[in-house]
Amino acid sequence: MANVDVLDLGGKKVGSLELADELFAPSEVNEALLWEAVKHYRASLRQGTHATKNKKLVSGSGKKLWKQKGTGRARVGSVRSPLWRHGGTVHGPQPRSYDYAFPKKKLMGALRSALAAKLADGKLIVVESFEVSEPKTKLYRTALDKLEANRSTLLVESSQSLTENLYLGARNLANVELVLNNEVHPYDLLRYERAIFSRAAIEKLQESLQKTVSRRRKAEVA
């Protein structure tokens, strides 16, 4: 079991937390799986509203310009022909969804890899609680500075512990995103430089991820 320090919002150690080796060991990092998860996530974000005008949609008359035979010229149907300038586009992009099915086991494996990578890089921080006295952005900005999270930061709180003070105080922080423990995605962990979990959030996330690890893998790590 790996131990991680639990801090308060002032940056002082107030305890420690044991993390499961089958989730947070450096050997659990699978870069290929992380790439697949990020590719799927970014594909699902695409609007897919691109469209080109084909022969049916482009403006222009559909009348045949000249008779089929006898003129010596090449046969032609209308000015909307794809062969002509300002004609329709052939096989151009049309509106579609770029989303595709991604196995849940792969997603959970990628999440374990992202967490292990963050811990190995020393960029994963656990705090006892995000609670402050009032919903002030300044209070959270000061807390992040003391936690040495001056750049982009991902805040992860459990759904049961989310408070109005945290929601209102963190929403106006630049380069900071707040998510719940059941919403965190590998892409979020890779996108932000530091990830700060509350104790409740990391415990619940660890509990749910342990259910996705095979017994064989648990035995190998043990």
UniProtKB/Swiss-Prot annotation:
Instruction: Cite a GO CC annotation.
Output: ribosome
Q: What is this protein called?
A: Large ribosomal subunit protein uL4
Kindly name one Pfam family recorded for this protein: Ribosomal_L4
State whether keyword NADP applies. Answer: no
* Free-text function comment from the UniProt entry: One of the primary rRNA binding proteins, this protein initially binds near the 5'-end of the 23S rRNA. It is important during the early stages of 50S assembly. It makes multiple contacts with different domains of the 23S rRNA in the assembled 50S subunit and ribosome.
Question: Which family does the UniProt entry place this protein in?
Answer: Belongs to the universal ribosomal protein uL4 family.
Q: Name one GO biological process term.
A: translation
Q: Is rRNA processing tagged as a keyword?
A: no
For this protein's source organism, the top of the classification is:
Bacteria, Pseudomonadati, Acidobacteriota, Terriglobia, Terriglobales
Species per Swiss-Prot/TrEMBL record: Acidobacterium capsulatum (strain ATCC 51196 / DSM 11244 / BCRC 80197 / JCM 7670 / NBRC 15755 / NCIMB 13165 / 161)
